[in-house]
């Protein structure tokens, strides 16, 4: 994990919708909750500007974060976030404490590479279809990957890449595969592009339809 994310957090005692609105409007901070582990859930807030900057990086969503909270460093991951329905800015965050000795389950994005140069596309004229943009993994916090690469270079026409075909970092497991072979779902496939009807065919069809109506 090459990226490092640090958020300055503060404890808060005021709760409720009114308190949250004041926090966002007057202090430009985002309310949240920190839970998990052996400690009790804790109401917190983080700086809006700092959080928005971190959210611009895809890795933030699947990364161990460091919270500076009450003079201590707390390791956590983003579990959930509420956004404004129209403006899109964060309204509330749920953060889960992590312990380096306990596995966590997280969704990690897939990065598809070598698509245009793949055998099925470049040499055989196919198109690549994605079935998933992310997968759920289970691992120790220190093994959590920012993303999983799906190399399509050798994918031929009519071939399918399944979950079991993904190359995973050491110590990382796919939760779906742990459920059995029936859950080995297709991640991507190379197929023939759909043929669109030509304008001549469309004109002919319209002519036949018009003739049938006369």
UniProtKB/Swiss-Prot annotation:
InterPro entries: Rbsml_bL25/Gln-tRNA_synth_N, Ribosomal_bL25/Gln-tRNA_synth, Ribosomal_bL25_b-dom, Ribosomal_bL25_C, Ribosomal_bL25_long, Ribosomal_L25_dom, Ribosomal_uL5_bac-type. The keyword ATP-binding does not apply. Pfam families: Ribosomal_L25p, Ribosomal_TL5_C. GO terms for biological process: translation. Keywords: Ribonucleoprotein, Ribosomal protein, RNA-binding, rRNA-binding. Residues 200-214 have a biased composition (Acidic residues). One of its GO terms (molecular function) is 5S rRNA binding. GO terms for cellular component: cytosolic large ribosomal subunit. The keyword Membrane does not apply. Residues 1-23, 182-214 are annotated as: Disordered. Gene3D superfamilies: Ribosomal protein L25, beta domain (2.170.120.20), Ribosomal Protein L25, Chain P (2.40.240.10). PANTHER family: RIBOSOMAL PROTEIN L25/GLN-TRNA SYNTHETASE, ANTI-CODON-BINDING DOMAIN-CONTAINING PROTEIN, RIBOSOMAL PROTEIN L25_GLN-TRNA SYNTHETASE, ANTI-CODON-BINDING DOMAIN-CONTAINING PROTEIN. This is one of the proteins that binds to the 5S RNA in the ribosome where it forms part of the central protuberance. Part of the 50S ribosomal subunit; part of the 5S rRNA/L5/L18/L25 subcomplex. Contacts the 5S rRNA. Binds to the 5S rRNA independently of L5 and L18. NCBIfam families: bL25_bact_ctc (TIGR00731), PRK05618.1-2 (NF004128), PRK05618.1-5 (NF004130), PRK05943.1 (NF004612). Belongs to the bacterial ribosomal protein bL25 family. CTC subfamily. This is Large ribosomal subunit protein bL25. The lineage of its organism: Bacteria, Pseudomonadati, Pseudomonadota, Gammaproteobacteria, Oceanospirillales. The gene is rplY.
């Amino acid at each position: 994990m090459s990226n490092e994310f640090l958020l300055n957090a503060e404890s808060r005692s005021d709760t409720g919708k009114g308190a949250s609105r004041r926090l966002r409007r007057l202090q430009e901070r985002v309310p949240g909750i920190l839970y998990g582990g052996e400690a009790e859930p804790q109401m917190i807030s983080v700086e809006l500007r700092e959080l928005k900057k971190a959210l611009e990086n895809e890795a933030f969503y699947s990364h161990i974060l460091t919270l500076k909270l009450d003079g201590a460093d707390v390791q956590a991951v983003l579990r959930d976030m509420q956004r404004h329905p129209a403006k899109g800015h964060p309204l509330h965050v749920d953060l889960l404490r992590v312990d380096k000795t306990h596995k966590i389950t997280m969704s990690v994005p897939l990065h598809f590479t070598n698509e245009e140069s793949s055998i099925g596309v470049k040499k055989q004229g196919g198109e690549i279809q994605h079935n998933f943009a992310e997968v759920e993994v289970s691992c120790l916090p220190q093994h959590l990957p920012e993303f999983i690469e799906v190399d399509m270079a050798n994918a031929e026409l009519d071939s399918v890449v399944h979950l079991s075909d993904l190359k995973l970092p050491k110590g990382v497991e796919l939760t779906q595969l742990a459920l059995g072979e029936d859950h080995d779902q297709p991640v991507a496939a190379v197929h023939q592009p759909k043929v669109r009807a030509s304008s001549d065919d469309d004109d002919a069809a319209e002519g036949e339809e018009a003739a049938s109506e006369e």
